Amino acid sequence: MRTDERRRWWVKPKKHITLVFITITMIIQFQMKGCVSCVETERMGLLQLKSYLKNLVDAEEEEEEGLSILKSWTHHEGDCCRWERVKCSDAINGHVIGLSLDRLVPVAFESQTRSLNLSLLHSFPQLQSLNLSWNWFTNLSDHFLGFKSFGTLDKLTTLDFSHNMFDNSIVPFLNAATSIRSLHLESNYMEGVFPPQELSNMTNLRVLNLKDNSFSFLSSQGLTDFRDLEVLDLSFNGVNDSEASHSLSTAKLKTLDLNFNPLSDFSQLKGLESLQELQVLKLRGNKFNHTLSTHVLKDLKMLQELDLSDNGFTNLDHGRGLEIPTSLQVLDFKRNQLSLTHEGYLGICRLMKLRELDLSSNALTSLPYCLGNLTHLRTLDLSNNQLNGNLSSFVSGLPSVLEYLSLLDNNFDGSFLFNSLVNQTRLTVFKLSSKVGVIQVQTESSWAPLFQLKMLYLSNCSLGSTMLGFLVHQRDLCFVDLSHNKLTGTFPTWLVKNNTRLQTILLSGNSLTKLQLPILVHGLQVLDISSNMIYDSIQEDIGMVFPNLRFMNFSSNHFQGTIPSSIGEMKSLQVLDMSSNGLYGQLPIMFLSGCYSLRVLKLSNNQLQGKIFSKHANLTGLVGLFLDGNNFTGSLEEGLLKSKNLTLLDISDNRFSGMLPLWIGRISRLSYLYMSGNQLKGPFPFLRQSPWVEVMDISHNSFSGSIPRNVNFPSLRELRLQNNEFTGLVPGNLFKAAGLEVLDLRNNNFSGKILNTIDQTSKLRILLLRNNSFQTYIPGKICQLSEVGLLDLSHNQFRGPIPSCFSKMSFGAEQNDRTMSLVADFDFSYITFLPHCQYGSHLNLDDGVRNGYQPKPATVVDFLTKSRYEAYQGDILRYMHGLDLSSNELSGEIPIEIGDLQNIRSLNLSSNRLTGSIPDSISKLKGLESLDLSNNKLDGSIPPALADLNSLGYLNISYNNLSGEIPFKGHLVTFDERSYIGNAHLCGLPTNKNCISQRVPEPPSVSTHAKEEENEEEGNVIDMVWFYWTCAAVYISTSLALFAFLYIDSRWSREWFYRVDLCVHHILQFKRSSVCN
């Protein structure tokens, strides 16, 4: 016993001594690390570098944008190892080994030169990592060492020059950086042949990122100089060389990214078999199509990941089979056109090591039951196809190790039993919805699943009461989407209580009637209950219960009352949408001062009032502000100046008055300005700094005066000035904006000449000049608007002929691939809301809240067609093409070239002085829906071919001098007499005039016919002198007879005068009663 006690006595002190020794060692190391201080020469070098970078930023721009470059780099702070963006070695005299200088300098225009002086880096001989991305440098320079500048940095291994504006001129400088192992040149302006010969000395490269440049050819020398290269990224270039894969051959290459190049044939990849160590091959977004021939991949024995998404494959090679190495673990076929049968699936089902498979966004119709044999499959995405069949049976046969299953947006119908997932013990993500019907989702009430979901998507389904019972067993949910499920009653507070890690809950498009919040504070980040039927007021303590909310959408409900002040406690809130409710009152000061992280604030279509943005406002992060459709009054206050990143401002349809304040021009990033429908007045808004303005809508106000001649909006895309009181000339500078697409000047008093500065590069698609005071000829230069789709020059005083060159204008004839930016006004795609519990995968899965939030609807354009104004927006606007020249003083004939506008849908030439006949070429306008030629001087007959215009929904050729029989056949039988009135010589249906009585027998000879015509003309001559004498005699005779009759018969005379007196009495009595009323 004593021996054991002595042993225990010795062991205890030994343990204590060991702990003490470890503690002392850690303290010494910590103190030594804390004593690290940088070398003085390097400290001074950093200060010189800061000074150089600051000089690249204009002092005024720095002040306005709030830039403060490298604030901690000062003379007062001696230890530069403590400075931001600086990393030092662990030695006592620490050398600078890392500089992270990304995103310091604001965006430069393409015409601006911004040089990086490499000699400033010579002070850091131990530098290992340098990041200068996102600074928009254009070139490198070194007046001391020239191209050999990087040679002094022989420890440099990582260099990041991505997202600048470098071109090939930097290549000789890079060739001296022989120690670099990782080089990033993504998103620059490099082009030509890859790899450039000048890079032959960079033999130590392991990682080379050239994404998003313009390399189009590959050197025949290939990658022989880069023998150790393991990762090569040439995505988003123009690589289309037929010998691409031969040039890329290098023994050690493990990852090859050729995403989004114009490769079109797998035969271009024959040399891939030499890449024996290749593990990752990415060919997304190329131009491969039709059947996939994979025999060129069969020798890649190490291949583990293959990305063939975003191509045009329609099928797999059945003859050879799917010759993909069995080592494959990740296969991505999403966004192709695959329509696989059972035999087509078999090739995939032979890949027994497959762990992740994405077949989403194809044309699949049959369920791939053979996937149940893939015992290692953990990720399966079949979303956005046309799958149908017995869903419960298919799901029950899937591998038990499955973790991720997406069946969103298919053609499933009927019921789905949730307990068919009984074999799935590891399932964490489940997604289900249908495009064609409502899926009845049910489960057994007693079933308790073995899995715990993290993400559940069940949108556009019908959840039974037992299904909600299933959710009670889930305690680890992070993301829940139950939108469009016909849910009723109260907001499911229990779902929030049971899942303490819940970050996102989407309940939009249901029929919830009450919002009841949990009592305890919760970490919820995304809450969407839009488009329900909630009539409550918003609880005052909502900001206390959900202080971590980042996204809050309460729009399209029936909320009443005021906005809670406690929302100001949501310090992380980025998007707040309470539009289309019944909220009233003023904006709380606590809300305006506390939500400094807010980027999107949408309060449209409520009953809010008062003045906005006093000095208390502190919305410094605001990017988009939507206050349209309220009752705000007064003028804008300067509190908005704190929102220096404000990009979109919409205050339309309020009661703002007075002049637009000059300070609004100091919001330098303002790109979208909507102020229509107020009571603003004064001259055209003067924006001092306006390089970014894309959309300006100040219509329906009382602005007056002329537009300054020197107005300059280089980025302008849409300008709306209609329904104001502007006068004077339209400045030519407006048309110099290269991207101008919409110009609406209707209902003003502009005059003078127009369009004198238009050139063939103009992208103008919508030009509306209705109801102004233009009095000139329509200039021929207007035909240079080759992309125009809607043109309205009506209700002016244009004179002269219609230009025949209108046929050169597209009106939809030239549909190019350029997306009409006017379809989507504003996109917050850079604001993402993905939960932290996002499923980990090598696939690019679409998880979380939608990646972009677009709170602004598509552009709306009103255009007169079918005798009424129609509103066109979104994709419909893309296909609407119309020409309106009505109510002018145009003369001459309708040019036959008008028939070349074959995609036009509305043509209005009414109320002019046009003569001649209706050209037969109009019958070529097969897409025409509205034709108005009324109130002109057109003559001749109606072309019979008009009956073949099957799309015509409105026809008006009234009040002309047309003659002959109406071709009442084909589509013209749908129009009644109103389309033809005012043409005295038209006959036939639908009029009541018979054409037979007006027909003249065919003359026997030319001389007889001429004689008949002469006699007819003589017989039709009226002697006007005899006509006047006859009328006078009849009038006098009738008057004498009336007076004699009344004089002779006294009874009739008394009755006559009685009736006259009675009529006068009734008139006087009616007049008195009207005055009294």
From Swiss-Prot:
Q: Where are the LRR repeats?
A: 124-147, 153-176, 177-201, 202-225, 227-250, 251-274, 275-299, 300-324, 326-348, 351-376, 378-397, 399-424, 425-449, 450-473, 474-498, 499-522, 524-545, 546-570, 572-594, 595-621, 623-643, 644-666, 667-694, 696-713, 714-737, 739-761, 762-785, 786-808, 877-901, 902-925, 927-949, 951-970
Q: Which InterPro entries match?
A: Leu-rich_rpt, Leu-rich_rpt_4, Leu-rich_rpt_typical-subtyp, LRR_dom_sf, LRR_N_plant-typ, RLP_Defense_Trigger
Residues assigned to the Cytoplasmic compartment are 1046-1077
The answer to whether the entry has keyword Nucleotide-binding is no
Q: Provide the residue span(s) of the region labelled N-cap.
A: 39-120
Topology: which residues are Extracellular?
Answer: 39-1024
User: Can you list the GO cellular component terms from the UniProt entry?
Assistant: plasma membrane
Q: What happens when the gene is disrupted?
A: Lack of responsiveness to MAMP eMax from Xanthomonas.
Renumbered to this chain, the signal peptide range is 1-38
Principal place where this protein is found?
Answer: membrane
Gene Ontology BP terms: defense response to bacterium; innate immune response
Pfam family name, one:
LRRNT_2
Sites carrying a glycan are 117, 131, 139, 201, 240, 289, 373, 390, 423, 460, 498, 553, 618, 631, 645, 749, 771, 908, 956, 961
Region annotation (C-cap/acidic domain) maps to 971-1024
Q: How does it sit in the membrane?
A: Single-pass type I membrane protein
Q: Which residues cross the membrane?
A: 1025-1045
Which SMART domains is this protein grouped with?
LRR_SD22 (SM00365), LRR_TYP (SM00369)
Q: Give the location in the cell.
A: Cell membrane
Ordered alphabetically, the record's keywords are:
Cell membrane, Glycoprotein, Immunity, Innate immunity, Leucine-rich repeat, Membrane, Plant defense, Receptor, Repeat, Signal, Transmembrane, Transmembrane helix
Protein purpose: Involved in plant defense. Confers resistance to the bacterial pathogen Xanthomonas through recognition of the microbe-associated molecular pattern (MAMP) eMax. Functionality seems to depend on the presence of the receptor kinase SOBIR1 as an adapter protein.
| Recorded family membership | Belongs to the RLP family.
* Protein name per its UniProtKB record: Receptor-like protein 1
Which organism encodes this protein? Arabidopsis thaliana
